[in-house]
Amino acid sequence: MKILFIFIYFSLINLLFSYDFEVEILSAGDERDTNIFKYSDTITYRHFNNTTNWKDNLGDWGKLQCAGNHTIIKNQGTILKNYCKGTNKDGDIFWLMMDRKSNDFDSGIGKIVYEKGTGKFEKYDGVQCVYAITFLPERDGSFIKSKCKFKDK
């Protein structure tokens, strides 16, 4: 019984010291930054570079530079791999990677992993987040919202 009490106690303490962190990313599309290669009737490959803006629910905001690719397979979905470098208003930097496998190019759910950071972002190393993306109807912009669970160190 004592062991169960200790386990519950430390589990509750762990929950108390974790908090949610949300990031919103807004982008405007520019076809000049996208290369499209139609591999076959069923596979289309898109490579892109873009710069977007982000803000979080902690009052921080900044710029995000990304490069990545989408592989769209007809009747099977899309696979995304995106690498980004973010800078906040104070000059702190973070690097993250976005992965998504979904049925639809225009919307889906994926994973963000913070690879490393400087300044305030040092403590985010290795943190994983879930994100959802929706593109505008003409695919000339998108909205991403991510939710992360951080632990204080």
Task: Locate the predicted segments by residue.
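Structural motif marking the loop-to-transmembrane transition
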Residues: 1-4, 106
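Sec-dependent N-terminal signal peptides
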Residues: 3-14
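Beta-strand-enriched cores of mature, soluble protein domains
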Residues: 19-153
